[in-house]
Amino acid sequence: MAGERAQNLQDTFLNHVRKNKIPLTIFLVNGVKLQGVVTWFDNFCVLLRRDGHSQLVYKHAISTIMPGHPVQLFEQGEEGAEKG
């Protein structure tokens, strides 16, 4: 169940930043920093667009994703906002 929740959170986050065209900074496991907007994603990769160019990034290479501004995915009190 924890794996399903993590996948659902990942999909929810990526879909939100894609729909709202929120700029992201993505750090890869090798330290490379990428910036752009998510235009598409699936279970294995993310398509990142910047300055008219697209980059296909494999999720296993991603370390951290930082949105350009705060993202509110859940309303307070919703299941996804539970305290840990």
UniProtKB/Swiss-Prot annotation:
GO cellular component annotations of the record: cytosol
Top-rank taxon, per record = Bacteria
Q: PROSITE patterns per the record?
A: SM (PS52002)
- Entry-linked InterPro entries: Hfq, LSM_dom_sf, Sm
| Signal peptide range in chain numbering | none
Q: Name its GO BP terms in alphabetical order.
A: regulation of DNA-templated transcription; regulation of RNA stability; regulation of translation, ncRNA-mediated
Pfam families cross-referenced by the UniProt entry: Hfq (PF17209)
Keywords, comma-separated and alphabetical? RNA-binding, Stress response
> What is an example of a GO molecular function annotated in this UniProt entry?
RNA binding
Sm domain location is 11-71
- Return the similarity comment: Belongs to the Hfq family.
Q: State the protein's purpose.
A: RNA chaperone that binds small regulatory RNA (sRNAs) and mRNAs to facilitate mRNA translational regulation in response to envelope stress, environmental stress and changes in metabolite concentrations. Also binds with high specificity to tRNAs.
Complex formation? Homohexamer.
Q: What is this protein called?
A: RNA-binding protein Hfq
Specify the species. Methylobacterium nodulans (strain LMG 21967 / CNCM I-2342 / ORS 2060)
